[in-house]
Amino acid sequence: MSAFVVLGAQWGDEGKGKMTDYLAETADVVVRFQGGNNAGHTVVVGDKEYKLHLVPSGILYEDKINVLGNGVVIDPKALFEEINYLEDLGVKVTKEKLKVSDRAQLIMPYHRILDGLKEKARGKNDIGTTGKGIGPAYTDKAERSGIRVCDLMHKDVFEEKLRQNINDKNELIRLYGGEELDFDKIFEEYNAYADRMRPYVTDISVIIYDEMKKNKNVLFEGAQGSLLDIDYGTYPYVTSSSTVAGGVCTGAGVGPTAITGAVGIAKAYTTRVGKGPFPTELLDEMGEKLREKGHEYGVTTGRARRCGWLDLVILKSTARISGLTSFVVTKIDTLAGFDKIKVCTGYEFDGKVIDYFPASLEDLAKCKPVYEEFDGWDDSIADARSYEELPENAKIYLKKIEEFTDTKISIVSVGPKRDQTIVVGEI
């Protein structure tokens, strides 16, 4: 039995969808343990492209159990839109293939509305929310006023909790100048969701535990990236959940001793969507070249991603915090054609060089990246299928990542398709 965590090692958009899909081939269970439909990833199978936001990547296989854990916040409307989208593409989403935690929190219409109103009120200090209601849903969870999936399954309980929330939230919405919500309309809408959701709902911690006892392989699929973690990310420009490996324990009801490994997905350069610090960001033609070559536009928002050189300080931090057993390096094919390639190996801060990521945004703003320069390679590597086929300079680049982070590279991705994957060693 193996229980592996797959998580983003940067600010998200590292290629987790492709790699989770690839690794899911040998998994029996694929579990989402945090986040919501604010995440987006693309999986390419043959000539078909699937854009997923909430449903685990294992859904593309016929024989996998896919789990939305209690750490996920679920927008029923978004969930069923995604299920309809998948079924239109010929992917069956049955109650045997998809399991939804009865303890997961629901995203309600007032969460989405308040997300937008609060972001607008922040003005120039906005934090770049996707507007999906994720943050407000986690806020309600923390203050114990949230509505869970199990509440939705009991009409009278749901009615009472919804009425209280509508009363409270309408006061807030009025304060922000928004339009009040109608209880009856939402109650009717969500009761319809309850009927459709009921077959999928269960205690997912029991499902996962039972599968592990049968020596089944479990893959825990993270959303966003480690630098968006609520505690270890660039706060407040973060998401509202735990995106590091520790989030699996609370977000899926799994004990830490059950986890056998953690794999960090790292892009061969660095990108970020929205506001927040980004020490190696390139605001010149080089950054634009990376964006266009790498097609760096968000799956969920369509926003252009900010691009920059690879930051090894970030990867070293992620490896330490999540106890990574290996890295998967993606999109190294994008770097083909660059004469010189830089990587950040430290920050100049207050007259000295540091190799850690400061907690304070004010301190981080003072940090200037210290670069090491490498020779690039001209040849396209999209057709490479073994480590030996990679250009020598690409191998030197990858070796630097391993040495600096003290973490081996297990897989190198040279394109978006399943077969554009080079296995270097054991995960």
UniProtKB/Swiss-Prot annotation:
BP-aspect Gene Ontology terms: 'de novo' AMP biosynthetic process; IMP metabolic process
Keyword Cytoplasm tagged: yes
Catalyzed reactions per annotation: IMP + L-aspartate + GTP = N(6)-(1,2-dicarboxyethyl)-AMP + GDP + phosphate + 2 H(+)
Keyword RNA-binding recorded: no
Keyword list, A-Z: Cytoplasm, GTP-binding, Ligase, Magnesium, Metal-binding, Nucleotide-binding, Purine biosynthesis
Entry's EC annotation: 6.3.4.4
Cofactor: Mg(2+)
Stretches that traverse the bilayer: none
SUPFAM superfamilies, alphabetized: P-loop containing nucleoside triphosphate hydrolases (SSF52540)
Chief localisation class: cytoplasm
Residues reported in the UniProt entry to bind Mg(2+): D13, G40
Record-linked SMART domains: Adenylsucc_synt
Subcellular location as annotated: Cytoplasm
Pathway, per record: Purine metabolism; AMP biosynthesis via de novo pathway; AMP from IMP: step 1/2
GO molecular function, one term: magnesium ion binding
Binding, substrate: V299, T300, T301, G302, R303, A304, R305
Record note on cofactor: Binds 1 Mg(2+) ion per subunit.
Enzyme class: ligase
One family name in Pfam for this protein: Adenylsucc_synt
One of the record's GO cellular component terms: cytoplasm
Description of how the protein assembles with itself and partners: Homodimer.
Family per record: Belongs to the adenylosuccinate synthetase family.
Primary role: Plays an important role in the de novo pathway of purine nucleotide biosynthesis. Catalyzes the first committed step in the biosynthesis of AMP from IMP.
PANTHER family the UniProt entry points to: ADENYLOSUCCINATE SYNTHETASE
UniProt protein name: Adenylosuccinate synthetase
Organism per entry: Clostridium novyi (strain NT)
